[in-house]
Amino acid sequence: MGQKPKVAFICVHNSCRSQIAEALGKYLASDVFESYSAGTETVPQINQDAVRLIKQLYGIDMEQAQYSKLLNELPPVDIVITMG
């Protein structure tokens, strides 16, 4: 079987929407594609409401596994989804 496509979810600060998409992509579709997220700017920490809700709903601790990243920190990707 070939390599899974790499999907990047992109928003401005990489603090909420794209972080949620990356976490859910890893949780729900890791057998289909590799999930990444980034922003055009970064923030010191990801959105705490997003962290709380994803942990409450899916048991995923985004704060332990994810951080705000810039576009140039990602590996080459196959698909880009903007979440502006």
Question: What does each of the following model-derived ranges do?
Answer:
Residues M1-G84:
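Short polar/charged helix/loop
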